[in-house]
Swiss-Prot record:
It comes from the Eukaryota. It comes from Dictyostelium discoideum. Belongs to the eukaryotic ATPase epsilon family. One of its GO terms (cellular component) is proton-transporting ATP synthase complex. One of its GO terms (biological process) is proton motive force-driven mitochondrial ATP synthesis. This is ATP synthase F(1) complex subunit epsilon, mitochondrial.
Length: 74
């Protein structure tokens, strides 16, 4: 089973699924690859509240997270 390999590699299932999805998108021909690249990005906002008021906002962007992961690997 493939589950044994991602566990043996020391990665989570979500990391494994992300790697597989990236490889599949890279195999697509150009007009379809560009459309798939546009769909894979995301932006998420997280708002922290203290005493019923907004204290801080964190914006999670897929591009920023990818850069952070590359920095952690090196």
């Amino acid at each position: 089973m493939a589950g044994q390999y991602w566990r043996a590699a020391g990665i989570t299932y979500l990391q494994y699924a992300n790697i597989c999805g990236t490889h599949v998108r890279n195999c697509l021909k150009e007009p379809f690859r560009a459309a798939a690249k546009n769909r894979e990005g995301f932006i998420s906002n997280t708002v922290m509240y203290q005493n019923g008021k907004e204290s801080s906002t964190i914006i999670l962007n897929s591009e920023l997270l990818q850069k952070e992961l590359l920095v952690k690997k090196n």
